[in-house]
Amino acid sequence: MSKIGLGILTYKRPDYFKECIKRIDNSKINEIVVVNDGTPYDFDVPYHLIQHAKNKGIGISKNDALKYLQSKDCDYYFLMEDDILIKDNNVFIKYIEASLETGIQHFNYSQHGLMNKKPGTEIPNPRTRIDYKNNVSIDLHMHCVGAFSFYTKRCLAESGLMDDFYFNATEHLDHTYTIIKKEMHPPFWWFADIANSNQYLEDFPWSPSTSTISQSNNRSEIIAKSYEHFTKKHGHHILQTPNLPLDQVKEKLKQIYKNK
């Protein structure tokens, strides 16, 4: 029987964290780990806790969660930041079913924040939708958002974990690009999510003032260094990553499907 693991990332937002975990149906998940990258909370955490002694950043925090879940020999891995709320706990099986049908080994929830929504609305704005058999459909979005992510065991085995260099920016973009290069995800700028994912997940009411990363005093410097590292690593600036036409994207999806 397949084993599902969930890693929850939190940083100095006890109220968010409490609401986040309150929405989780433990019967849907085999292993849960919490990584607290900030000061300890003054209440008990009901799951295995990795408490950092100092702020290590989101890249290392996500890796710590994934390493713990790998030690438990999970087959499917989910990472969730503390400002994501579960609306329907069938979300886990929906991502797994989509992976099994399409062959795509990695998905990111697209509807966190505003980047993949129609301007001024909460309506998803995918570049296209692809329909498969067995009532599975996926949406492909322009922007890669890393607040809720799915990986298979195969994906992590072949692509490795996140680059520890990234502190509070770009870690998910770099990792997803690595997975794309392994041909387990559609091309860059066509980021995969299950169709209608906003029926299963939602954001905690968000604004720049509630984002611990957006409020960082050296946010611009962190982003600049992350883009510089990405450029050295991949040979081009992140914004120069090729944006393939839809017909080529569909051919890539066919190849991923054949290799599942």
Locations of regions flagged by a protein language model:
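Short, well-formed alpha-helical segments that are part of the catalytic scaffolds
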Residues: 13-26
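A conserved acidic beta->alpha catalytic loop
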Residues: 34-44, 85
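Glycine-rich, basic loop-to-helix element that forms the pyrophosphate-binding segment
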Residues: 53-69
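Short beta-strand-to-loop acidic/aromatic patch adjacent to the donor-nucleotide binding site
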Residues: 74-85
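Conserved donor-nucleotide/metal-binding helix-loop-beta segment in metal-dependent transferases, i.e.
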Residues: 90-106
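Short beta-strand-to-loop element that shapes/binds the nucleotide-sugar donor at the catalytic cleft/hinge
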Residues: 107-122
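A recurrent flexible, glycine/aromatic-enriched loop bordering the glycosyltransferase active site
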Residues: 131-151
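C-terminal catalytic/acceptor-binding lobe
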Residues: 165-260
